Swiss-Prot record:
Annotated Pfam families: Pribosyltran
Recorded catalytic activity of this chain's protein: orotidine 5'-phosphate + diphosphate = orotate + 5-phospho-alpha-D-ribose 1-diphosphate
Organism from which the protein derives: Methanocorpusculum labreanum (strain ATCC 43576 / DSM 4855 / Z)
Record-linked NCBIfam families: pyrE
Name of protein: Orotate phosphoribosyltransferase
Pathway(s) annotated for this protein in UniProt: Pyrimidine metabolism; UMP biosynthesis via de novo pathway; UMP from orotate: step 1/2
HAMAP family: PyrE
InterPro entries in the cross-refs: OPRT (IPR023031), Or_phspho_trans_dom (IPR004467), PRibTrfase_dom (IPR000836), PRTase-like (IPR029057)
Gene: pyrE
Keywords assigned by UniProt, alphabetized: Glycosyltransferase, Magnesium, Pyrimidine biosynthesis, Transferase
PANTHER family per UniProt: OROTATE PHOSPHORIBOSYLTRANSFERASE, URIDINE 5'-MONOPHOSPHATE SYNTHASE
């Protein structure tokens, strides 16, 4: 099977090798930089079209920062609303953690990269607190570091568009 997203991630050099500390705190010999790669419209639109076509949702949400451009692109491709989950509460203006209306909506959370699943779990918790109905997370790349299991314990299915093992093969 041809995976256009995988091909574009490779083309736009989404994998770098070296010594890295991941958001989870884990050490890694490689870094998957989807945030930079999706600045290319060809890749971003391919991801958006795939998610819009393949998944059933009423609202797409992303955790700041990596999930925001993805959520906006999917929103445009699917012609459905999007929401943004703040990484932290603001101390000015409105103090809401979520920008957008998710209450009573079937929400799909999108992530750029998952490893342990901590960011996704946080996003799911915030969405549920706001009254969203959520049972799935889509990630562009899953590093296969426990996110699937962590989310399953929360009743959430993880849907990777690409797995790290495919990207590194």
């Amino acid at each position: 099977m041809v995976n256009r997203i995988l091909d574009l991630l490779i083309q736009y050099k989404a994998v770098e090798f070296g010594d890295f500390t991941l958001a989870s705190g884990a050490q890694s010999k490689y870094y998957i930089d989807v945030k930079t790669a999706i600045m290319q419209p060809e890749l971003l639109s391919e991801i958006a079209a795939e998610v819009a076509k393949k998944y059933d949702f009423e609202c797409i949400a992303g955790v700041a920062v990596g999930g925001v451009p993805l959520a906006v692109a999917v929103s445009l491709a699917a012609n459905k609303p999007c929401a943004v989950i703040r990484a932290a509460a603001k101390d000015h203006g409105k103090s809401q953690m979520i920008i957008g209306n998710v209450k009573g909506q079937r929400v799909l959370l999108i992530e750029d990269v998952t490893t342990s699943g901590g960011s996704s779990k946080y996003g799911v918790e915030e969405l549920r607190k706001a009254g969203a109905l959520i049972d799935s997370v889509v990630t562009v790349v899953d590093r296969e570091g426990g996110a699937e299991e962590l989310l399953a314990a929360e009743g959430i299915t993880l849907h990777p568009l690409v797995k790290a093992s495919e990207l590194l093969a």
